[in-house]
Amino acid sequence: MNTYLDLCRFILQKGSFRNDRTNTGTKSVFGYQMRFNLEEGFPLLTTKKMNLRSIIHELLWFLKGDTNICYLVQNNVNIWNEWPYQKYQQSAFFQNETLKEFLEKIKNDPLFAIKHGNLGPVYGKQWRDFNGVDQIKFLISEIKTNPNSRRLILNSWNPPLLNQMALPPCHVLIQFYVHQGKLSLQLYQRSGDVFLGIPFNIASYSLLLMMVAQVTNLQPYEFIHTLGDAHIYSNHLAQVQTQIQRTPKKLPQMILNPDIKNIDDFKFSDFTLQNYQCDGILKGDIAV
């Protein structure tokens, strides 16, 4: 994954310090592209240990059209917890619960989860019901019947609903491309947290590419990741400096259950990662 480390080095060398919405501060560049050939292995970062379980569960959650953190919390996936908890803290229902206590209520009290666990019409809602359109169903049908189309688009940016979302989509637009029996996917990401988010996004959208390729009888080929504002938060600079000193290892292989022919039939047990060798964990706080 030298491709990713090159991005880190580029930002460290060429980036500008900027203020941001979270008041954390970033070092940032605008406009950057990375390419990952899935025939060379599954692009899961090896210069720090990645939480693949969270990546898979979040992607399945998107594909279910779900927007409530309850499923994620029940599967010990914590990447979306801060946003509904922050909203709950500002509500009249807040009784000084800690984040841990809040999550226990989400996990064990269905009515509480319905009321306080929803993120608004975020990714899953837009993927499966964009103003009445199931974009995933349409995409798969189009790839099968009209593979040369230049309209194989998945869009998460729905302007009238942005202010109802806990966080407007960062990974905004996806385009698929079919050539000689191979399927590629390009993601445009308006904003990318290079230390925490980007490695997660690379693996997630590469996995989505593999899933869609399987159910459309194509071979997964290339994931292209195009970034708008690519930034390293100021409180992640030390971790990134550590990471770029590490030597990438050979990429692992991701095996999908070959019996799955429908995108909605995938479950967590249908994914097997083989030969993953990595360096140790590098932690960093998420900016909310």
Curated annotation (Swiss-Prot):
It is found in: Cytoplasm. Its main location: cytoplasm. DUMP binds at R21, R150, R151, R190, S191, G192, D193, N201, H231, I232, Y233. GO terms for biological process: dTMP biosynthetic process; dTTP biosynthetic process; methylation. Keywords: Cytoplasm, Methyltransferase, Nucleotide biosynthesis, Transferase. Catalyzes the reductive methylation of 2'-deoxyuridine-5'-monophosphate (dUMP) to 2'-deoxythymidine-5'-monophosphate (dTMP) while utilizing 5,10-methylenetetrahydrofolate (mTHF) as the methyl donor and reductant in the reaction, yielding dihydrofolate (DHF) as a by-product. This enzymatic reaction provides an intracellular de novo source of dTMP, an essential precursor for DNA biosynthesis. Homodimer. Belongs to the thymidylate synthase family. Bacterial-type ThyA subfamily. HAMAP family: Thymidy_synth_bact. This is Thymidylate synthase. It comes from Onion yellows phytoplasma (strain OY-M).
